Amino acid sequence: MKLPFEPVIFGYEINIHLILEYLAFFLGYRYYVFLRKRTNDTIVSSNRLSIILGAAIGAFLGSRIMGFLENPVFHLDETSILELFNAKTIMGGLFGGLLGVEIAKKIIGERESSGDLFTFPIILGIFIGRIGCFLSGTNEFTYGKQTNFFTGMNLGDNIMRHPIALYELIFLIILFFVLKKLKNRNIKNGLIFQYFMIAYFAFRFFIEFLKPNYFLIFGISSIQILCLICLLYYNKTILNLFVKNAS
């Protein structure tokens, strides 16, 4: 299959990435509803709705802010301004959503951990979205640097590159089943989501070194800086994890 994958149906070119992005939101939400019906949710529906609203607002703002900071250079022309408004990243969305949830919980006075129920739907959504990124090839900035490694692929510019989106798809499958196994052990409420955030942001920190980032601060990208901030945010969980394993 040639990348970017741009199918034409009835003379119209289909934006496969956009379709899969919408599908990711839809199936992710349906999976959340499915899980909530089968879970003894200790958070009342009104509070859960407020939490979802906080997550949505935070994710929207976070994804746009980090989308701009990923490459904060633009020109005052119509194309550049349009690209600026369309710039977004899942990393900013996740961390922004996290902050949005915490703010919403402070406002409504909710003290129960709320993230576990969202964890697997989020992974599903990211997975579907990354399929779209992979099929988009070099049209989306999820491709890697040029490489002679055996995993190198022609993603649309006739250069053998690291297929970053494909690496992430494999990682997400592994992470999904690892977290499922942990969940079956009935660990403390809230830890599944925290482990997801720690694992995903740590993975993204290291995988960013394989991307041809142009805007760097002290040798790392803005996404990597966000990853470090997130890992610092969960420093107690990380420390407890190492202490627990050591004992």
Q: Which residues are covered by each model-predicted region?
A:
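A feature for loop-to-transmembrane-helix boundaries and adjacent hydrophobic helices
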Residues: M1-S247
